[in-house]
Each structure stands twice: as C-alpha cells, then as structure tokens.
A protein has these predicted regions:
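N-terminal small-domain helix-loop-helix segment of the aminotransferase-like
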Residues: 100, 110-201, 208, 393-396, ...
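Tryptophan (W) side chains
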Residues: 8-11
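N-terminal mitochondrial targeting presequence
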Residues: 69-99
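Conserved PLP-binding catalytic core of the aspartate aminotransferase-like
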Residues: 143, 409-416, 420, 428-476, ...
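Conserved core of the PLP fold type I
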Residues: 69, 162-303, 320-338, 462-463
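Helix C-cap/helix->beta junction micro-motif
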Residues: 130, 237, 307-308, 429, ...
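PLP-dependent enzyme catalytic core of the Aspartate aminotransferase-like
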Residues: 221, 270, 454-462, 470-526
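Conserved core segment of the aminotransferase class I/II
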Residues: 93-94, 114, 236, 333-432, ...
Length: 526
C-alpha cells in the first residue's frame, strides 16, 4: 500500500469540497463545470473506505478523468460501482471504468464507417477447407519463372547491403529499368527519380494515389464492375465514389458472350463528370470481367478527362495477359494523357509472384511529387531484396522481350490455354462463361442453373450469387467469388447472377476442377 499512501494526498485534494467564488453549494466530487478543468473521480467518496480507495488507486495508478460529455462523472461512477460497495474492488472495478471509457470514446475513425466489413474474408475462409478447389483467389498456384526465383535467391544470399534500406522512392536499379522498359512502350522520356515510385504492391500504389490526390468532397468516377478496393480507398480519402456501369449487349443464341460486348454508354459516362470530379480510375485489362478497353473507348475517356481537367488512375497490372489477338493500349500513351495519368503496375502479376508485393507508379513529376510525400510519411520504403529481384527479372525479360523465349509471351500463351480449358469445363454443367479478353479472370452466368437448383440457404436480402457460391463450395467443392461484390450497393441486385473464376492455375488444379465438374454433371442428369 506504499504506492497508495504516496498518492493519497492527491486524491484527498481532488475530493475536497470546493466553493464557487461568489458562494454557493460545494461541488460534488468529480463534477466538471462545462468548459472547466477535469476533476479526478474520488474513490473514497465512491467506495466509502480509505483502504478500498487505496487499492483501487494502486491498481489504476492515476486519477480517472472521463470526457466532458458527462456533466457529473461521480454520479455515473456511483451507478457503476454501487454493487461493489464494501467488497474488494480488484479487476471488477477496473472493468467498470474501462467499460465507461469505452462508452465515452469513439475508437473507430469515421472514415472507416461502412467499410469495416469485407466479404472476401468469409469466402477465402470457406475456400481454404480441405478438398476445396480454390478458383476464387487471384493468384497462380505454380512457381514463378526460374530466372525470377534465381534473382530473389541472389538478392538474399548476395550483397549484404541489400538487407538494409535503399532509396525511399525505389531501389535505383529497379527505377532505372522501369523507366527504360516502360518509357519505350509509352513513348516518353521517363526520369527514374521524378517519374517512378516503387510501392508495396499495386495495392500500395493505389492507396498512395488516392491519399495524395483525393480531398474531402472530391468525386472519383469508378467503372463497374470494379476491383473492390477502389470504393473504400476513395471513401477513406474523404472522396465520393461516382459509379458508371458497363452494360452487356443482349445474349446471342448459341454463342458465348464476350466481355467486349460490355460497353460504356458515352452519354451516361459524360454525365458523371462535374466540377467536383478529381479522378477517374480505369482498370484494363479489368478485374473481374477481363475486359480490354479498345483504343476508341480509351479515346472517349481521355477526351472527357482532358475536357474536365481530371486525373486518370490507370490500373494496368494485367497488361501482359491479353488474349485472342487483342492489344493492350496504355491510356498514358494517348496524346495529352501522360501529363494527367498515373499508370500502376505489379511485379506480382507480371512475374507470377504475388507474395513479393512490389508495385510501381509511373507518371508526370507534377503528380508523382504528391505521391512521394504520402509514401515518405507512411510506407517510407519497400523491401530492398524484393526490389532487387524484380530489377534483375526485368533485365532478363528486356533481353528476351517480344521473342518466343520471353516470359511475357510464354505466360500469355499458357494462360490463354487455361482460360479455354476452364470455359469448356464450365459449359459442361450449364454455366455460360463470358469470354475474357485479358487478366486472370472470367465471369460466368449462373442463370440457367436456377431452375435446377434447390432453394439456396441464406438471408433473403443476400445476393443470389453470394448464396450460390457458398452452396457450391459446400456441396460441390469448388470455390469462386460472387460478382455482386464488385458492384456498388444500388447496382448489386442487377448483377447477382454471375460468379468470378480465376483460371491462372496449375494443370493439377484444373484437373481437380474437372473431376468435381464431371461429378456435378452426372448428378444433373440428361
């Protein structure tokens, strides 16, 4: 009790009756006049005995002051600890005060309101069970190319200084090769110090861009379906998402639909631009649809961005995965667009090493300098060894680029074969895949199975595709992602008859998928 004795004078002073300067009743211990100084809560007044108050003080160490939202803290504390009078206080009293403080303070920042629930957690957990073929998550389940693995091994076992910090905005050999490689593709003279920022994955690049450019009340145009982080990142920056949907053309009898049939309405898109529009985010090839925006579509977007002085955030992480002879065009390469475009890339998607978490942003210095500020004061630095491995991998690819030995060429060819395999297999059970032009993904229409399906469990307000995926995981052993989560809340009900499949998987995974689909087909009967 030595600690209690040492501080008892402070407690006594806190509880001593004090009179207003002009006379009047003494204040209740713990009372706080509006705008006045905080007053310690008096345990002796609350509990009645010096020993009990000393024990409470010894546990809590300092007087407890609650926020100004309560005019009479003592009255509230008396209500909480009333049942403890005459009893040993201990942890119970602490718990009471912790509960009171919890009620008095808001812990969650308001910018997280409405975005604290993430459906991915649930679907990933369901798909991680044994014997589930996980076609939901977007990562390859096969090794990166041998040259990339060797590059990482060199980085880990070679120069010991690669264990230390490097330049905050990017490991110099990496920023140089990115500037050289993409400068030729974009037709720009890219300065590796001013026009390149290396980030913790493309996710980090997106977050940094939103934080650097989007202010309170700014509007960001998002094209639906969209990679799901675009909306919460806009909200966390204080912006307002403005959605515009790609509209599918009517289905053609006997033919599979293509994602090229999903188009923007030029009039609707133009109507979304206002004086408050700060940015438009463009994902091509897109996730989840796999759409590769045509040059004509990009020119429409570019003209509107220039007309309204809007920044384009171009998420191009799947640029090397384009199928059936389609061509990826970077919007930054169009006339007048380099100076207002941030182009985002991913080493994980480029070299099939998503766990490396190395991404980058390319853009004009007038924009990049603001991303540098955010990066410097948040992430500061990305792992040096991973950056060194990516730099060496790009150097290898640059020597083979455009040749049959190029990894980009070989990976694209293998991914197209996997895409075709998965589409044939899905059709065998009555699903109608939408042919993707690029990316890791395809979406498939599940409408035709509705008549053959049992009533699916789940809440009545839960989108149909969400209930379908849960049923499919549990009953068919196949994991996928409902497409409705890639839409804003008002539009989900219009697109809840699609699911997303990742087809960039190992051959053994695709064979396991085939077995489960064949069993499903047998159960459906003729």
């Amino acid at each position: 009790m030595e600690s209690a004795g040492k501080h008892w004078g402070a407690w006594e002073g806190a509880r001593a009756p004090r009179h207003r300067e002009e006379g009047g009743a003494p204040e209740t211990p713990g009372m706080r006049e509006p705008g006045g100084p905080r007053t310690a809560v008096t345990f002796r007044a609350l509990l009645g005995t010096r020993s009990e108050a000393s024990e409470a003080e010894e546990e809590l160490s300092v007087p407890v002051a609650l926020g100004g939202m309560f005019k009479n803290v003592a009255a509230i504390c008396l209500h909480l600890v009333g049942p403890l009078r005459g009893k040993k206080t201990g942890a119970s009293l602490t718990q009471c005060f912790h509960q009171t403080l919890t009620m008095a303070k808001r812990l969650q920042a308001r910018r997280l309101d409405g975005i604290d629930y993430n459906p991915w957690v649930e679907f990933i957990k369901l798909s991680s069970e044994d014997d589930i073929v996980n076609l939901g998550q977007g990562f390859p389940d096969f090794p990166p190319p041998a040259f990339a693995v060797e590059a990482f091994q060199h980085a880990v076992s070679g120069d010991f200084m690669l264990n230390q910090y490097t330049t905050a905005f990017g490991y110099p050999p990496l920023t140089r090769i990115l500037a050289s490689f993409f400068g030729k593709l974009l037709g720009q003279e890219i300065n590796p110090r001013k026009n390149v920022l290396v980030t913790v994955g493309a996710y980090g690049a997106l977050f940094t861009a939103f934080q650097a450019l989007v202010d309170e009340g700014d509007e960001v145009i998002i094209i639906e379906p969209f990679f799901d982080c675009y909306e919460p990142m806009t909200l966390m920056a204080g912006g307002r998402p403005v959605f515009v949907s790609l509209k599918p053309s009517p289905t053609r009898d006997g033919e599979l639909d293509s994602c090229s049939d999903w188009q923007l309405d030029p009039v609707e898109l133009a109507s979304k631009f206002t004086s408050r529009t700060k940015a438009l985010i463009l994902n091509t090839p897109s996730n989840p649809l796999g759409k590769v925006f045509s040059r004509a579509e990009l020119e429409l977007v570019a003209s509107l961005c220039q007309q309204h002085d809007v920044v384009c955030i171009a998420d191009e992480v799947y640029q090397w995965l384009v199928y059936d002879g389609y061509q990826h065009v970077s919007i930054a390469s169009l006339p007048g667009m380099w100076d207002r475009t941030l182009t985002i890339g991913s080493a994980g998607k480029t070299f099939s090493a998503t766990g490396w978490k190395v991404g980058w942003v390319l853009g004009p210095g007038r924009l990049l300098k603001h991303l540098h500020t955010v990066h410097q004061n948040s992430i500061f630095h990305c792992p040096t060894q991973a950056q060194a491995a990516v730099a060496e991998s790009f150097e290898w690819e640059q020597l083979h680029f455009g040749q049959p030995s190029s990894y980009f060429v070989q990976f694209q060819q293998a991914s197209q074969r996997s895409r075709d395999h998965v589409m044939r297999s899905l059709q065998s059970v009555g699903l109608r895949p939408i042919i993707p032009q690029g990316s890791y993904f395809l979406i498939t229409d599940i409408s035709e199975l509705k008549s053959k399906m049992p009533d699916l469990p789940g809440a009545t307000d839960e989108p149909y595709d969400s209930r379908f995926v849960k049923w499919m995981i549990k009953n068919k052993g196949l994991g996928a992602i409902p497409v409705s989560i890639f839409y804003s809340a008002p539009h989900r009900k219009h697109f809840d008859h699609y699911i997303r499949i990742c087809f960039v998987k190992d051959e053994s995974t695709l064979q396991a998928m085939d077995k489960k689909l064949q069993k499903w087909k047998d159960e459906l009967g003729p």
